[in-house]
């Protein structure tokens, strides 16, 4: 109100006169002006932060952005959850999902299959369970695709192996698996379960022989339900629809470069609700149960079943002290 009165003709409305008219002090007026300027500056600060993160992760959602904002700036530039969302919406920074599909799994083969070992298993430390899957990345200006193979640690959610190929040949999932095995060098791989769908690549002799050579137990989905390999499916979606959102690739080599940057950001900077807001690399330093910021009814059912069988203590060990503050280290 005061600002509107002054803007009509500043020569006619000095601050003192306007304040007397409205029954407020000059100090209150200038304090209000300072607060307004601070709010405007804070709004621009939030927008620049969101744009900075979106340059690295174009599809990251508002919840994680707000979590990262609070982690980085704390109370110095505090913005409430609702205000943060209002700013994102006001500046057109909300994201919308889109879909385009290519077939990546072909289970119509005569190769040996393996049982699902994960139905009643919850990993209690890294290098106990990994999930592998293949997704597609469209190439610009054509109906062609390249294919991303990922291997994810189901405890820490760290992507421990990846490869981008121009076809669905087994060599590319093998490259991702070899990277994962190097990541686990020195670990007891006889405790590790490798879980995947029943696709030709994962059932191939080249792939299963490499797993057996390192003593890794093989697990496969027993139905066509994506939920049977949910973690791998979720990570695929995060990389493709969030971190690579809106990006177009002229070639496979260009896609490989973008994927390398996306995986680095995902592992080292992006918070994950399934590991209590930590990054995957932070969680890889932990041991024992990590709190989730959502309810996993599957984990609850498994724990109840194990408790009834007297095996809960063997399934879940106490969390290591200080794991939440583990420092971020590059892989």
Predicted regions and their residues:
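RNase H-like two-metal-ion nuclease catalytic core shared by retroviral integrases
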Residues: 104-107, 196-198, 204-209, 218-240, ...
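A short acidic/small-residue loop/turn micro-motif
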Residues: 153-154, 164-171
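C-terminal domain-tail junction helix/linker
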Residues: 212-216, 238-331
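Basic, flexible linker segments flanking DNA-binding modules
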Residues: 19, 26-126, 225, 281-293
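Mobile-element integrase/transposase regions
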Residues: 81-150, 175, 179, 183-184, ...
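Short, amphipathic alpha-helical "recognition" segments used to contact nucleic acids or chromatin
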Residues: 1-12, 47, 51-56
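Conserved, non-catalytic sequence blocks in retroelement Pol enzymes and Pol-derived host proteins
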Residues: 59, 73-76, 122-124, 139-141, ...
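Mobile genetic element proteins and their domesticated derivatives, centered on retroelements
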Residues: 18-19, 29, 50, 65, ...
């Amino acid at each position: 109100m005061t600002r509107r009165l002054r803007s009509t003709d500043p020569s006619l409305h000095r601050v003192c006169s306007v304040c007397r008219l409205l029954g407020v002090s000059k100090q209150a007026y200038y304090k209000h002006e300072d607060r307004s300027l601070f709010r405007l500056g804070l709004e621009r600060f939030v927008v620049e932060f969101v744009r900075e993160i979106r340059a690295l992760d174009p599809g990251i959602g508002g919840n994680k952005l707000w979590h990262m904002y609070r982690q980085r700036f704390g109370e110095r530039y505090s913005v409430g959850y609702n205000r943060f969302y209002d700013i994102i919406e006001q500046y057109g920074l909300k994201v919308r999902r889109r879909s385009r599909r290519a077939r990546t799994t072909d289970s119509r083969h005569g190769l040996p299959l393996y049982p699902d070992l994960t139905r009643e298993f919850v990993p209690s430390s890294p290098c106990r369970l990994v999930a592998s899957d293949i997704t597609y990345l469209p190439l610009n200006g054509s109906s062609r695709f390249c294919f991303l193979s990922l291997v994810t640690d189901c405890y820490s959610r760290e992507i421990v192996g990846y490869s981008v190929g121009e076809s669905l040949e087994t060599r590319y999932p093998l490259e991702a698996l070899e990277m994962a095995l190097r990541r686990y060098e020195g670990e007891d791989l006889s405790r590790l379960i490798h879980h995947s769908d029943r696709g030709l690549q994962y059932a191939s002799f080249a792939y299963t022989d490499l797993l057996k050579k390192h003593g890794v137990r093989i697990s496969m989905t027993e139905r066509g339900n994506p939920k049977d390999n949910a973690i791998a499916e979720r990570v695929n979606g995060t990389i493709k629809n969030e971190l690579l959102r809106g990006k177009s690739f002229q070639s496979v080599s260009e896609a490989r470069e973008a994927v390398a940057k996306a995986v680095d950001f995902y592992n080292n900077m992006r918070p994950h609700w399934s590991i209590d807001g930590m990054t995957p690399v932070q969680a890889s330093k932990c041991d024992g149960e990590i709190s989730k910021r959502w309810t996993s009814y599957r984990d609850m059912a498994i724990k109840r079943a194990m408790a009834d069988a007297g095996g809960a203590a063997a399934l879940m060990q106490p969390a290591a002290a200080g794991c939440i503050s583990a420092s971020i280290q590059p892989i």
